[in-house]
Amino acid sequence: FPFLMEERRVCRVLLLGPPGCGKTTVLRDAAKRLAGDGIRVSVCDEREELFPEDAAQAGLDVMRGIDKPTAIQMLLRAMSPQAIFCDEIGDMRDVRALLDAARCGVGLAASAHAGVFDDVLHRPVLRALYEAGAFERYLLLGRHGKLAAAYDAEGKPISGGGIEHEKRRGDGHDFAQRDRLCSGGRRNAPRPLGAGHAPNPDADKRHDSL
């Protein structure tokens, strides 16, 4: 699982990809692998899709059917996780919960529907996470769950890790075009966590079904 670990520390990673590309499977396998390596992994499985079966044998602490804000707070207080895995990000309440976890120094792994990295900047919920510096890495899945591209916290491509290097629209190489995607002709650069930046809870009052 390239780009997920850095010197025994679990990074904050957002897994991107179209529906049906295998995001859930990749998250499930990664959580099991980390737990097998002795890392304390907790799972927020709101939709009961990540671990519908008993996860105790995998050494995971799983909370099923509970909304992410509630589950993440309970996991942080009770389980002392080194990493929290959760299913697809939904709305601004999820954003705030993930930022709380990130500021506690916990590794994160979550997923969201996106065909290309630039979709992150077009969707208010994902853009709020990007601008707040919630994730250190963005991993884009291609066909059959293969890693098609990887980006750092600023959206710059990362090489290595078995990336397929598929040539796709908006693959992150036209930074001038990406800068124009945001209102006013420019985007807000990601800020380090703790820099005083908070997402606007009114940015997306509707549920952004990912």
Segments (PLM) and residue ranges:
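Conserved catalytic network of the ASCE P-loop NTPase/AAA+ motor domain
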Residues: 6-8, 34-36, 54-55, 75-79, ...
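Glycine-rich phosphate-binding P-loop
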Residues: 11-30
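Glycine- and other small-residue-rich loops at beta-strand/loop junctions that grip anionic moieties
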Residues: 16-19, 61-65, 86-88
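P-loop NTPase switch/communication element
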Residues: 34-77
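Conserved P-loop NTPase nucleotide-binding/switch module
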Residues: 80-81, 87-143
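Intrinsic-disorder-associated, low-complexity terminal segments enriched in Asp/Asn/His/Tyr and depleted
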Residues: 174, 179, 200-204, 208
